[in-house]
Each structure stands twice: as C-alpha cells, then as structure tokens.
A protein has these predicted regions:
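NAD(P)H-binding glycine-rich loop region in Rossmannoid oxidoreductase-like domains
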Residues: 49-93, 105
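Flexible, glycine-rich beta-alpha linker
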Residues: 120-121, 142, 166-188, 213
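Conserved catalytic-site region of short-chain dehydrogenase/reductase
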Residues: 78, 113-127, 142-148, 160, ...
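C-terminal substrate-binding subdomain of Rossmann-fold SDR/epimerase-dehydratase oxidoreductases
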Residues: 129, 198-322
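Short-chain dehydrogenase/reductase
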Residues: 89, 93, 139-151, 183-191, ...
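N-terminal Rossmann NAD(P)H-binding glycine-rich loop of SDR-like oxidoreductase domains
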Residues: 4-23
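Active-site Tyr-X1-5-Lys
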Residues: 140-171, 194-200
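Conserved Rossmann-fold NAD(P)-dependent oxidoreductase catalytic core, especially the SDR/UDP-sugar
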Residues: 97-140, 166
C-alpha cells in the first residue's frame, strides 16, 4: 500500500489532492495540518495536527509514509504577500527544513513539493517553460522567493543526500473551497471577485489596469496533475507546470465571473484600484512537458469551473447570512 502524507491537506488545493488520492484504493492517506480538518477528511484519513516546523513533529507525521506531498505554507492573495513578507519567509523556510529532513530520515520513495507560478514572477519567455526557471530573475516578492527557495531545498537535498523529489508548480488555482476575505487581496482573486459581484458591487473593483494575464486552473485539475507527477516514474527529479493553457486578462476573468453570477452583461463596468508594488504583468506557462511525460492536461474549462465555484460560494455565503 502506498501511504501518502499530505502536508497542508486541509487547505483548498490540499483538500482537492486528498479527495483525488482517496478516490484511488491503492492510496492510504495521512493529512497533517494545524487547521481543523473537515469531517469527511477525519472519517477517511489519519489526521496529524502538530506544528511541522518542529523536527520531531515533522518526523512523527512522516513516519510510516512512503510518499510526501508538501503543500503546507503561508499562502493567499497578493495583498497577503505584501502584508506578511517576513512571516511567510520564516514559516515556509522552517517547514522546508523540517519536512525535507523528515523525508530523508524516513527514506520516503518520493517527495513531491508543490511550488508556485510565482517563481516565474519576472519571467521573460512566453509561454514559460520549466527550463526558464534557471534564467528567470529572482522573484521580488517574499512569497515568490520563498517558493523558489523550496525548489532549491529539494534539489540541494537530492544532490547531497539523494532525496527523490518532484516539483509541481500550480498556476492560478481556483475552485470550490476557498472563502473570500473581508480585506481585498488577502484571498485569491476569483473568490474575492465572486463575493464583490454577489454583493452587488458596481462598478466592479479590480487591482491595476486589468490587462495583466493569468491562466486559471481548477483545483481538481491541479490535484490530478500533482498525483500524476508523484505517481509516475517519469516524474522523478523533474519539475512540471501544472496549469491550464488559456491566457486570460484580469478584465476578461472579471467579466466571466460577472456573467456567471447572473449579472447583466451590458452593465459590466470596472473600477481600477492602485495595484501593489509587485504584481505579475503576465502569466502564461508552457504545459507541454506534463502532457508529454505524465499524460496529464487540464480538462475543466474556465466558464464551467467559475460557474461551479460561484454556485459553491453562493451557497456558503447564504448559509453564513442565515
């Protein structure tokens, strides 16, 4: 039996990965997260609640597992990265140190690190290939730097100690599971925008000109990609862009969300707020490597995925107001 430790398994992407693993009887799943695991997860998985920054807790969580998928990190929207730069750098680095050491100590068969598209914050090649990570200038944001540091940690642990690693870089994750925050920019853009539209905001506020581009990737597609990379012999010591392929402007994404919330297309209007010091102008990855080596590609279209997310969030917000 393949026993997989999913760190950060109670998060939005983590929960999608756990659901994907539980759908395959060949996987036994252990989740480690300081957040409360939902009931379905507690009923289906072994749940560990220790602080993985502590080496003894990371070791306890990893013991008996053959595979690790490392998602535990401080994440969020662009405002969160600017609000907590030292905290997220410190926490994420401590997690790398303890969790990777535990993986080495317990001789896991595969350590899969879930990185971020933010390592390509200053990319100059489009569509951006995995190989471009070595030519891309160092990220300016603390978050981008911290996720790049995790990739360096994996490769260093392999070079010195033989860590069997795989790196996955999700791009612009969205889907049911993430609630918006009262402060704009703390959560990711999609739940933030859905909440604004459902609340009746008009004109709809976005950060920046709206010409910035993103590649929205549904969490279920990301989960499939991460598990495919972890499971495949071809994924060993490789890195993969885990992303949809359609490049959309933020303004186009806002319009898709507006119409998915049943607002009149003729009334669509944007208000442009000042953007942040670091805001990625363009994000468009090359996804051919994952398709070629793993047989994986994103399957959920943006209109379908956004409609699903709107329905989920509408139900949660209605329940909260009841």
């Amino acid at each position: 039996m393949t026993r997989v430790l999913v760190t950060g398994g109670a998060g939005t992407i983590g929960a999608a990965v756990v659901r994907r693993l539980l759908g395959d009887p060949s996987f036994d799943v252990r989740v480690s997260d300081q957040r409360a695991a939902p009931q379905w997860m507690r009923e289906s998985c072994e749940v560990h609640t220790g602080d993985l920054r502590l080496h003894e807790q990371a070791s306890e969580a990893t013991k008996g597992c053959t595979h690790v998928i490392h998602l535990a990190a401080i994440v969020g929207g662009i405002a969160n990265f600017h609000k907590l730069p030292h905290t997220l750098t410190s926490v994420n680095s401590a997690l790398y140190d303890a969790v990777i050491q535990a993986a080495l100590d317990h001789d896991v068969e595969r350590f899969t690190y879930v990185s971020s598209s933010m390592v390509f914050e200053r990319a100059t090649e489009y569509p951006t290939t995995e190989e471009h990570v070595f030519q891309t200038p160092m990220p300016r944001s603390a978050y981008g730097f911290s996720k790049m540091a995790g990739e360096v940690w994996c490769r260093a642990a392999h070079d010195e100690h033989g860590l069997p690693y795989t790196i996955c870089r999700p791009f612009n994750a969205y889907g049911p599971g993430e609630m918006p925050d009262d402060e704009p920019g703390i959560a990711h853009a999609v739940p933030d925008l859905i909440r604004k539209v459902l609340s009746g905001q008009h004109p709809l506020q976005i950060f920046g000109s709206g010409a910035q581009t993103r590649t929205l990737t549904h969490i279920d597609d990301i989960a499939d990609g991460v598990v495919a990379a972890m499971s495949s012999p071809a994924g060993l010591h490789e890195d993969f862009n885990i992303s949809a392929s359609e490049e959309l402007t933020v303004a186009e994404i806002a319009r898709i969300i507006w119409e998915a919330c049943d607002r009149d297309p003729a009334e669509f209007e944007l208000e442009h707020l000042p953007t942040f010091t670091v805001d990625v102008v363009r994000r468009w990855p090359d996804v051919s490597k994952a398709k070629r080596m793993l047989g994986w590609e994103a399957r959920i279209g943006v209109h379908e995925g956004v409609a699903q997310t709107v329905q989920w969030l509408r139900e949660r917000l209605a329940a909260a107001d009841a």
